[in-house]
Swiss-Prot record:
InterPro entries: Aldolase_TIM, Indole-3-glycerol_P_synth, Indole-3-glycerol_P_synth_dom, RibuloseP-bd_barrel. Its EC number is 4.1.1.48. NCBIfam families: PRK00278.2-4. This is Indole-3-glycerol phosphate synthase. Pathway: Amino-acid biosynthesis; L-tryptophan biosynthesis; L-tryptophan from chorismate: step 4/5.
Length: 267
């Protein structure tokens, strides 16, 4: 792992330990027994959009990022979510990490109530506890980052998430991650175009890694997607969907920005 990811994991370990002091894993499991709602199909929504000939987009709702700083002064996740769905997002992603991305689980809960589309929890998941918590929060899909997990954790966490009815998105950064991801029983991958060491993004990473994956994998490109030309380039390279955050959150009107990214600006 890089120094940045090491720091994030160390902080997460402390965060989870504190959460367990407030509520035990056994308590979470007991609460899960009372759930009656079923998760929305995150992957199904993206596949359906792609198969209809549309541009499958995951719009990311986030307040800030380590490389860009604060993206929105006025941050109203429910309204942003509604706007993005209105303008073409098939699914949403919500950052719940508080320390590095100024996210919050409350943002995710608010978004789930505001829109009918599936929602991905964007966080650094390193524990069973977070997966159980995710289901209780109404999460439809969790993100597992290969670089911060062992092979054993990847297998265990995928099984647990699926047992709870949630979809799983596996995130990779490089060829080493890709090789490990091929051993995980999930055929939905996200290629993060950003270098975790310096945060520079290269769309060519998605193009190159996609060619090394089996054709039946559903592959999402994320990070550094800022223009309609970027979206067209990635789709032409065989990517199945795109996840867009910063370009939307930094725009005055997120929905209009999304429309332009999908369809291009009108003359």
């Amino acid at each position: 792992m890089t120094k940045i990811l090491d720091d994030i994991v160390a902080y997460k370990q402390q965060e989870i330990a504190a959460l367990k002091q407030q509520k035990t894993e056994a308590s979470l499991i007991a609460e899960l027994e009372t759930l009656t709602d079923a998760p929305r199909g995150f992957m199904r929504a993206l596949r359906d959009c792609r198969d209809r000939g549309g541009v499958a987009v995951v719009a990311e709702i986030k307040r800030a990022s380590p490389n860009q700083g604060l993206l929105r002064e006025q941050f109203m996740p429910e309204l942003l979510a509604q706007e993005c769905v209105q303008y073409g997002a098939s699914c949403l992603s919500v950052f719940t990490d508080t320390h590095f991305f100024y996210g919050d689980v409350a943002y995710l809960s608010a978004v789930k109530k505001a829109v009918p589309v599936p929602v991905l929890r964007k966080d650094f998941i390193i524990s069973r506890y977070q997966i159980l918590e995710s289901r209780l929060l109404g999460v439809d899909c969790i993100l597992l980052i290969v670089a911060i997990l062992t092979d054993e954790q990847l297998q265990e966490f995928v099984v647990l998430a699926h047992d709870l009815g949630m979809d799983v998105l596996i995130e990779i950064h490089d060829e080493n991650d890709l090789k490990r991801a091929l051993n995980v029983p999930v055929r939905t991958l996200a290629i993060n175009n950003r270098n975790p060491e310096d945060f520079n993004a290269s769309l060519e990473k998605s193009a190159q890694l996609r060619q090394q994956l089996p054709k039946d994998y559903f592959v999402i490109s994320e990070s550094g997607i800022n223009t309609h030309a970027d979206v067209v380039y990635l789709l032409n390279c065989g990517l199945d969907a795109v996840l867009i955050g910063g370009a939307l959150m930094s725009a005055e009107f997120a929905g209009e920005a999304l429309h332009h990214l999908i369809y291009g600006k009108e003359d």
